[in-house]
Swiss-Prot record:
Intracellular or extracellular location(s): Secreted, Cell wall
Coiled-coil residue windows: none
NCBIfam families: PME_inhib
UniProt-recorded name of the protein: Pectinesterase 3
Tissue: In the peel, expression is localized to the region of the flavedo close to the oil glands, and to the innermost layer of the albedo. In the lamella, expression is localized to the cell layers opposing the fruit tissue, and to the parenchyma surrounding the vascular tissue. In the fruit vesicles, expression is restricted to the peripheral cell layers and stalk cells. High levels of expression are detected in the core matrix.
Length: 584
């Protein structure tokens, strides 16, 4: 550094002694450009030298907090980011005494980054040359960022109580669910700008901030998994038995569904709080109006009966509307229908006829429909981001992207899902049990994909599980199914995870079973499993030979994908009142 200073001193003296006005114009420009460049280089070197000097004069790497931080970050996918983000916090050494402290600090730093992104998006919305879809996509980003902030705050609160208040396994599943959803939200924001080249300049303006938050969430998730896995292993070893809560079941229902909610889902006589009737005979004429009038943040079940009729509207159950239940008069009689789609300027996220985010949502005896048709591309009938949500005796009908299982824990039982391309997709931990899943006739040249699962990180506790169900074709596809190949799924994201087990698969499914997304993308990192399926399309001898595909022969391995294990079903499904099975 001293030599650089000496050089610039001599250079400055030389330029002062020489009459610059005598230098030819072209040489003068070259001289000034060179001088400016060297100044920048010197400044950069000075900054780096200063940082190194501070590092050398400060923490020598032998301090206890340094070892804890380094050890914690070693379990992450982005250890350098993990370490540098926390090490940059003033007086970090006084705050880090355990891995739990490292995780909490990481969550707080991530929250600050998310808030920064929020303000950046608000600034972008002020641009005057935005297209319709860009505006919609930016509002999607504001919504998902708002949800991310809630998830991070909940994670910090849950972490502060860890390992008390709840069982270890419940703590682990709740924390991993929150961080998995927070990660998913970042990708959802960027996905809204991927429909055409015209809106990618806006995506570029957002990308760095969203990807940074996604990586920070990934690091927190990895550390949470490492901490909870270690603690649970210690408990199992010390008790010499499995954790009690891991084997608990309630009549085959996940335990997060209370006995009361189980009755609500199965009972033929339920007293609603309000009634929706298109003919004016109820409290409201539209479903959206009934939701808007529902109490916010409710801890008690709020029941909305939707009488027979066709309701042409788009409905959003926001995060503020918790524990809402829709009860229809029958899946062929109560129909909520819309036609938003990507071709006409919507995003996939906003195209949903019904979108549900409020925790604890239940629905039974209703059809959710999007009538946009196969030529309109992505057009969602039902989007679900509500944690601990369940659907019973419902139909989801559309073409491309019918059912968007966006995030969090979800359960579908006795439902019909019909569509064409990627018609069950998203990154929730979703189990579909005893459902009818039917491919429809697509446009000429299209292939049908039953699933497109969006797991983007190996530590996310997400995936799509289809159990004890029936996979077939609708009446319009059956006569021509040879012209429209149908597959069980393709990998939307790098760590896509889908399991089909104990189900009946007809010959509508191509012998290869699964299809690529784009060349070799994700073929080594995905997890696609099949277990004890039957039917003309269930044979596995002709299946793909990808590293990520496997035929599951072990009942123990398959058990991990049942509702009791995969969506912590023993702690909540009992409350829905819907029929279900927790195990194999």
């Amino acid at each position: 550094m001293t030599r650089i200073k000496e050089f610039f001193t001599k250079l400055s003296e030389s330029s002062t002694n020489q009459n610059i006005s005598n230098i030819p114009k072209k040489k003068k420009k070259l001289f000034l450009a060179l001088f400016a460049t060297l100044l920048v280089v010197a400044a950069v070197i000075g900054i780096v030298a200063g940082v190194n000097s501070r590092k050398n004069s400060g923490d020598n790497g032998n301090e206890p907090h340094h070892a804890i931080l380094k050890s914690s970050c070693s379990s992450t996918r982005y250890p350098d980011l993990c370490f540098s983000a926390i090490a940059a916090v003033p007086e970090a050494s006084k705050k880090v005494t355990s891995q739990k402290d490292v995780i909490e600090m990481s969550l707080n730093i991530t929250t600050t980054a998310v808030e920064h992104n929020y303000f950046g998006i608000q600034k972008l919305l002020k641009r005057t040359n935005l297209t319709k879809r860009e505006k919609v996509a930016l509002h999607d980003c504001l919504e998902t960022i708002d949800e991310t902030l809630d998830e991070l705050h909940k994670a910090v609160e849950d972490l502060e109580e860890y390992p008390n208040k709840k069982s270890l396994s419940q703590h682990a599943d709740d924390l991993k669910t929150l961080m998995s959803a927070a990660m998913t939200n970042q990708g959802t924001c960027l996905d809204g700008f991927s429909h055409d080249d015209a809106n990618k300049h806006v995506r570029d303006a957002l990308s760095d901030g969203q990807v940074h938050v996604e990586k920070m969430c990934s690091n927190a998730l990895a550390m949470i998994k490492n901490m909870t896995d270690t603690d649970m292993m210690i408990m199992r070893t010390s008790n010499n038995r499995k954790l009690i809560e891991e084997t608990s079941t309630v009549d085959g229902w996940p335990a997060w569904l209370s006995t009361g909610d189980r009755r609500l889902l199965q009972s033929s006589s339920v007293t609603p709080n309000v009634v929706v009737a298109a003919d004016g005979s109820g409290n409201f004429k539209t479903v959206a109006a009934s939701v808007a009038a529902a109490p916010q943040g409710g801890t008690k079940r709020y029941i909305i009966r939707i009488k027979a009729g066709v309701y042409r509207e788009n409905v959003e159950v926001t995060k503020k509307h918790k524990n809402i239940m829709f009860i229809g008069d029958g899946r062929t009689r109560t129909i909520i229908t819309g036609s938003r789609n990507v071709v006409d300027g919507s995003t996939t996220f906003k195209s949903a006829t019904v979108a549900v985010v409020g925790e604890g949502f239940l629905a039974r005896d209703i059809t959710f429909q999007n009538t946009a048709g196969p030529s309109k591309h992505q057009a969602v009938a039902l989007r679900v981001g509500a944690d601990l949500s369940a659907f019973y005796n419902c139909d989801m009908l559309a073409y491309q992207d019918t059912l968007y299982v966006h995030s969090n824990r979800q359960f579908f039982v006795n439902c019909l899902i019909a569509g064409t391309v990627d018609f069950i997709f998203g990154n929730a931990a979703a189990v579909l049990q005893n459902c009818d899943i039917h491919a429809r006739k697509p446009n000429s040249g299209q292939k049908n994909m039953v699933t497109a699962q969006g797991r983007a990180d190996p530590n996310q506790n997400t995936g799509i599980v289809i159990q004890k169900s029936r996979i077939g074709a609708t009446s319009d596809l059956k006569p021509v199914q040879g012209s429209f190949p149908t597959y069980l799924g393709r990998p939307w994201k790098e760590y896509s995870r889908t399991v089909i087990m104990q189900s009946s698969i007809t010959d509508v499914i191509h012998p290869a079973g699964w299809h690529e997304w784009d060349g070799n993308f994700a073929l080594n990192t995905l997890f696609y499993g099949e277990h004890q399926n039957a039917g003309a399309g269930a044979g596995t001898s002709g299946r793909v030979k990808w590293k990520g595909f496997r035929v599951i022969t072990s009942a123990t391995e398959a058990q991990a994908f049942t509702p009791g294990s995969f969506i912590a079903g023993s702690s909540w499904l009992g409350s829905t009142g819907f029929p279900f099975s927790l195990g194999l």
